[in-house]
């Protein structure tokens, strides 16, 4: 009986390892110490945070804090839009890419937005 339990335990441990080792990484980008997934549409790139992002918005007595999953839209014409930060711009350079808004900047150091089959569209938005 004990030998069967050891065999079962070993088998479950191996299966657990294999199941995590074979899962592809969906959140491939890191910006502002958060994990982001990247997808593309006809307008450009879409980055979605894996977990809620907490941001402080300074406005004197009317300052506020948000805590939610964010979506960043990086357009082909170098415009940027965010579900929490509003409108801005973005650009790419050898050191990575970033989106800049009125009160916040989200940087993705040493990374490049690339969508399968689209080539290097980010080069049009050089800093």
Segments predicted by a language model, with ranges:
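Bacterial N-terminal signal peptides
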Residues: 9-19
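Bacterial N-terminal signal peptides that target proteins for export
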Residues: 1-9
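Lipid interaction determinants
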Residues: 22-127
